[in-house]
């Protein structure tokens, strides 16, 4: 773009006259080829999960780039998540009826910035949102309030997308009502009118009790599952139960043996963005 802008800078007539026509034509062809090349690389915007930062997704973004996509990760640093503490000042937090806005307005702004950046850098007119963990429900809020004109598809990775069940003993809604609001007020996949794919990992089954050392991990994970879906014996990716990561009306996919997060992932504990796992769902990103 800078080189093209230089060509448009006012120049004395005599200097313009010395530029051969074939050079101008060649420059135009090169610009057209560059634009076509950019447009042929679909733009992906990766949305970090709760507690994560942009750099956590460097390897994932590089893998997407190697497969022909233009990847942009929304700019988030870990201290940004402290902004969510603003919700504590809202009486609805304590009532369990908290709404996502204005508490997560800062994150919605980061999505908007990343979408604009991706479009400008790739030459693509729309992007696919790939939302990890809590980024999934925040993507739903974004699409509901900002619209879908700039977005061609949404893919969520282990995102909690359903309201926490009420009336289950020992269960406290960790979102303080936000997921209930999202479920009741945000557009469904059918209403959005764009492809929505929800990926869930089936890495570890939770346990309701500890019957031995081998059950300890399942018990600890199960207590987390219970706070999200009401069932400690559910299957999930270690953080999000399968049932919570799937959304009515979406293309719901369960990935066997997949862990929740890039932090702590390995060949033995692959997450959604591990190359071998990405092989299993990358076609969901190739939408018209």
Which residue ranges define each predicted feature?
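Serine-dependent carboxylesterase/thioesterase catalytic core
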Residues: 48, 65, 71, 97-99, ...
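N-terminal chloroplast transit peptides
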Residues: 1-23
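Proteolytic processing junctions in secreted/extracellular precursors
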Residues: 3, 30-38
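C-terminal catalytic-base region of ester-bond hydrolases, centering on the histidine
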Residues: 193-288
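Glycine-rich "HGGG/HGxG" loop immediately N-terminal to the catalytic nucleophile
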Residues: 77-94, 140, 165
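Short aromatic-enriched loop/helix-cap "lid" or pocket-rim segments at secondary-structure transitions
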Residues: 58, 83-88, 165-170, 207-213
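Short, solvent-exposed loop/turn segments at secondary-structure junctions
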Residues: 50-52, 78-79, 136, 160-162, ...
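Short, surface-exposed "cap/lid" segments of acyl-processing enzymes
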Residues: 39-83
């Amino acid at each position: 773009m800078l080189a093209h802008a230089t060509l448009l800078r006012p120049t004395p007539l005599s200097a313009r006259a010395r530029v051969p026509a074939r050079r101008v034509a060649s420059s135009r062809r090169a610009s057209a080829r560059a634009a076509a090349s950019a447009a042929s690389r679909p733009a992906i915007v990766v949305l970090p999960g709760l507690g994560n930062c942009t750099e956590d997704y460097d390897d994932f973004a590089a893998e997407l780039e190697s497969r022909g996509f233009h990847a942009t990760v929304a700019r988030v640093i870990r201290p940004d998540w402290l902004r969510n503490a603003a919700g504590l000042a809202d009486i609805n937090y304590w009532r369990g009826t908290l709404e996502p806005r204005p508490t997560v307005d800062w994150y919605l702004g980061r999505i908007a910035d990343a979408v604009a950046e991706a479009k400008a850098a790739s030459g693509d007119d729309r992007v696919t949102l790939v939302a990890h963990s809590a980024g999934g429900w925040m993507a739903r809020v974004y699409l509901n309030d900002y619209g879908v004109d700039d977005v061609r598809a949404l893919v969520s990775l282990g995102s909690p997308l359903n309201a926490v069940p009420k009336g289950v003993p020992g269960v406290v809604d960790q979102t303080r009502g936000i997921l209930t609001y999202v479920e009741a007020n945000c557009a469904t996949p059918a209403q959005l009118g764009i492809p929505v794919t929800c990926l869930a990992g089936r890495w570890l089954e939770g346990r309701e009790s500890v019957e031995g050392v081998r059950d300890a991990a399942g018990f600890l994970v199960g207590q987390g599952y219970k706070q999200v879906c009401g069932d400690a014996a559910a299957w999930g990716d270690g953080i999000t139960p399968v049932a919570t990561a799937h959304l009515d009306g979406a293309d719901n996919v369960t990935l066997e043996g997949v862990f929740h997060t890039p932090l702590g992932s390995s060949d033995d504990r692959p997450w959604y963005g591990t190359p071998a796992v990405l092989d299993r769902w990358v076609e969901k990103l190739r939408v018209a």
